[in-house]
């Protein structure tokens, strides 16, 4: 499979699919899948192209999820090799999206192709959910496909997301969950005035300091065996006109929480509201829930993934829930068991992003073995 995976990876990288543009990547994949009798369904939403491709019927449904969009390349002059040339040097494939995640997407496609060729009459359903809206807004991609599938009661029981989960060597980490993410945009009201006449004004920076001190020091929980403790970080803060003689009339604070399963978004909102009342702050607050935490405990897919990684790489992966959010958060809402496995992530979103071509071949082998374990054939 390795040569096919490398060839498809290069073809995908050579398409400059800056999010949410797909630039023909999904069409290329669709043609391959159609050749091995996958049913194709195009699900465009807004400026995003999504592909739902299936082979077989019934249960269980094992889906592979990935994205064709990439982040911008930045200053191309900083790259050793052009970011969309997909050059291979010393067994390393260079290019934007090589590791995140056109390489693993190609590996998933070839693994599914190979499996259905070898097992044309398999039981259950194999699916690929591919979007071009993961790196940017993530509003019209996987989340919309999941909503569509749920509306028509079409389940996904197991899902492998091809995000680059490995850290130092292929297979050292498998993600079996992710923390939730919620952001607050908080506006604290004051009274603008002259700095020489503070008695005629109300400085929202000063009045908010005790609240911010408590907010940043508060311990939400102690985490658990699967998740680290919930953490809060102030991301942006702004007040004032830029002049040194004007007391600001408003303070804007944006903060984000990455939270574990010991709390939920309603607990967080309630506690923050309680703190704001405690200090008598005039305010308005807007919340944006990016994703709830999810965890695939020691289920069938987790065990199949661990076994496949051990067979292919000869190492036992660590199960981990750290890092940012992924599209797995949307698929988990269906009740699916979700894991993430893919190449080494050390160069993702960086200049000279690259992936080892041998690792891509091994990714394909892992995905193939997962198929053999989960789908009756």
From Swiss-Prot:
Identify the Pfam families for this entry: M20_dimer, Peptidase_M20
Active site at which residues?
69, 134 (proton acceptor)
Q: Which residues bind Zn(2+) 2?
A: 100, 135, 349
Task: Give the catalytic activity.
Answer: N-succinyl-(2S,6S)-2,6-diaminopimelate + H2O = (2S,6S)-2,6-diaminopimelate + succinate
Q: How does it assemble?
A: Homodimer.
Class in the EC hierarchy, top level: hydrolase
- What are the required cofactors? Zn(2+); Co(2+)
GO:BP terms for this protein?
Answer: diaminopimelate biosynthetic process; L-arginine biosynthetic process; lysine biosynthetic process via diaminopimelate
- Gene that encodes it: dapE
Q: Which InterPro entries match?
A: ArgE/DapE_CS, Bact_exopeptidase_dim_dom, DapE_proteobac, Peptidase_M20, Peptidase_M20_dimer, Peptidase_M20A
Q: What is this protein called?
A: Succinyl-diaminopimelate desuccinylase
User: Carries keyword Heme?
Assistant: no
Q: In which pathway does it act?
A: Amino-acid biosynthesis; L-lysine biosynthesis via DAP pathway; LL-2,6-diaminopimelate from (S)-tetrahydrodipicolinate (succinylase route): step 3/3
Q: What is its EC number?
A: 3.5.1.18
């Amino acid at each position: 499979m390795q040569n096919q995976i490398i060839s498809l990876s290069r073809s995908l990288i050579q398409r400059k699919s800056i999010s949410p543009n797909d630039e023909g990547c999904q069409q290329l994949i669709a043609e391959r899948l159609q050749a091995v009798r996958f049913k194709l369904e195009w699900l465009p939403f807004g400026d995003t192209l999504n592909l739902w491709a299936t082979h077989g019927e019934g249960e269980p449904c094992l889906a592979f999820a990935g994205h064709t969009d990439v982040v911008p390349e930045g200053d191309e002059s900083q790259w050793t090799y052009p970011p969309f040339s997909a050059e291979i040097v010393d067994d390393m494939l260079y290019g934007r999206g090589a590791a995140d995640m056109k390489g693993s997407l190609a590996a998933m496609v070839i693994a599914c192709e190979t499996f259905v060729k070898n097992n044309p009459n398999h039981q259950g359903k194999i699916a690929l959910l591919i979007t071009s809206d993961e790196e940017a807004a993530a509003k019209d991609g996987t989340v919309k496909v999941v909503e569509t599938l749920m509306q028509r009661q079409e389940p996904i029981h197991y899902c492998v997301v091809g995000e680059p989960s490995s850290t130092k060597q292929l297979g050292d980490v498998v993600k079996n969950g992710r923390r939730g993410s919620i952001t607050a945009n908080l506006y604290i009201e004051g009274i603008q005035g002259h700095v020489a006449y503070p008695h005629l004004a109300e400085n929202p920076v000063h009045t908010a300091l005790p609240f911010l001190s408590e907010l940043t020091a508060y311990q939400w929980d102690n985490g658990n065996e699967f998740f680290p403790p919930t953490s809060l970080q102030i991301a942006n803060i702004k007040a004032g006109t830029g002049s040194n003689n004007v007391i600001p009339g408003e303070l804007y604070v944006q903060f984000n929480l990455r939270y574990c399963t010991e709390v939920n978004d309603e607990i967080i909102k309630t506690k923050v509201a309680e703190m704001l009342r405690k200090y008598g702050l005039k305010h308005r607050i807007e919340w944006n829930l990016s994703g709830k935490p999810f965890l695939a405990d020691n289920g069938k897919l987790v065990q199949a993934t661990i076994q496949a990684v051990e067979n292919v790489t000869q190492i036992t992966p660590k199960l981990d829930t750290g890092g940012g959010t992924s599209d797995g958060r949307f698929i988990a809402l269906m009740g699916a068991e979700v894991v993430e496995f893919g190449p080494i992530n050390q160069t993702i979103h960086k200049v000279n992003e690259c992936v080892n071509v041998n690792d891509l071949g091994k990714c394909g082998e892992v995905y193939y073995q997962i198929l053999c374990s989960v789908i009756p054939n």
